[in-house]
Regions:
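Accessible peptide chain termini
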Residues: 1-2, 32
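Extreme N-terminal basic, low-complexity initiation segments
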Residues: 2-8
Length: 354
């Protein structure tokens, strides 16, 4: 039976059980260039079309995998060095806008790719301040995708981070705590308020998905891991990174090598956090996943393999999250080990096809 407050019956893992597993914070014995790839493990590999990833196959063949399961929020907050709990002195929570699509037996919750403008976020937060005025809740956008809620007193409900609830579910997630009913009531009332809002009427007229739900949450991973000295990422969470240098994600590994040189940062002290596969997972779209992965094979995995074989890098790692998450470490010139059997990536970094 699922732990109270978390959901079950979904093809996606229930991250509630990972709360009881200590997250393995990787300590770097030596600096190593890292590709953080959340969402790399597809939950149902048998759904995937044929994947053409020759460079990733080589990395898988000559690399060494070490398992380290991690819920999406733990992975993101740890490796990007996300810090939010210093933003307010008073009690607070967060609100993440969603597009929710209900099916006959499941619900799809999408938070990425909604292209919310700053103006839309401001208008909606202003309206919510009036709508939730009796509770004393004050909404304000930290970014178009993440809003803060200042509370008159600490919340007597707890709900998981947005990163742990997006995707497809047979049962909608719920909060826990003495006032979980207040949380559910507000979630429902806000959803009804959003339904007829002019912002959504305009979005639908423009062919964009409506913002028809809001996820209220307050649970954050407790992480003190030091992020890399230089990170490249387009994730909205990168705005809250403690890394001293955060740049936009490059189009290719050679572009990133040039950026690291311009920043006077050795590339082994840098990392790329590429989260485009998360949106494919949210949508449950294996074809978008396959297309993105095959682009990465040309833009990142092939140049990485060549850099390792030419000894331009002493080593590199690929890390991903999830129930079967972990680290694949590849050493320089490892391709000489010709006796290692060929491997084919089929949706899991550990190389297991189930």
């Amino acid at each position: 039976m699922a732990e109270p407050g978390y959901f079950s019956g979904s093809p996606y893992p229930d991250w509630g059980y990972l709360k009881n597993i200590p997250f393995k914070k990787t300590t770097r014995r030596t600096p190593m260039f890292t590709l953080f790839l959340p969402g790399l493990n597809w939950p149902q590999p048998e759904e995937l079309p044929s994947l053409h990833t020759p460079a990733l196959n080589r990395l898988l063949r000559f690399g060494r995998f070490q398992a380290a399961p991690a819920a999406p929020a733990d992975f993101c907050f740890t490796h990007l060095g996300v810090q939010l709990n210093h933003l307010f002195a008073e009690p607070y929570a967060f609100a993440s806008p969603l597009h929710q699509q209900l099916g006959l037996h499941s619900a799809q919750l999408q938070s990425s790719g909604l292209q919310i403008s700053p103006e839309e976020a401001e208008v909606l937060c202003h309206g919510l301040n009036a709508f939730c005025g009796e509770d004393g809740w004050q909404f304000a956008p930290l970014s178009p995708e993440l809003w803060s809620i200042r509370l008159p007193r600490p919340a007597a409900w707890q709900a998981p981070c947005i990163l742990n609830i997006t995707g497809q579910h047979a049962d909608l997630p719920q909060a826990v705590g003495p006032q979980r009913r207040q949380w559910l009531q507000r979630q429902t009332e806000i959803q009804m308020w959003l339904h007829e809002h002019p912002v959504n009427q305009r979005r639908q007229a423009e062919g964009r998905l409506p913002i028809n739900a809001l996820w209220l949450w307050d649970e954050m991973p407790d992480t003190h891991a030091e992020p890399p000295a230089l990170i490249g990422s387009n994730s909205p969470w990168a705005a809250y990174s403690r890394s001293p240098q955060v740049h936009p994600a490059p189009d290719s590994l050679p572009d990133w090598q040039a950026s690291a040189a311009e920043s006077q940062t050795p590339i082994e002290h840098s990392a790329l956090y590429l989260d485009e596969l998360q949106q494919a997972a949210e949508l449950g779209d294996p074809h978008v996943y396959a297309h993105t992965l095959q682009q990465w094979d040309e833009q990142f995995f092939a140049p990485l393999w060549h850099a390792l074989q030419r000894n331009h890098l002493p080593a590199a790692r690929l890390l991903t999250d999830g129930e079967h998450g972990g680290s694949l470490e590849i050493r320089a010139r490892s391709g000489w080990a010709f006796w290692k059997p060929k491997r084919r990536f089929s949706g899991r970094l550990d190389g297991i096809n189930k």
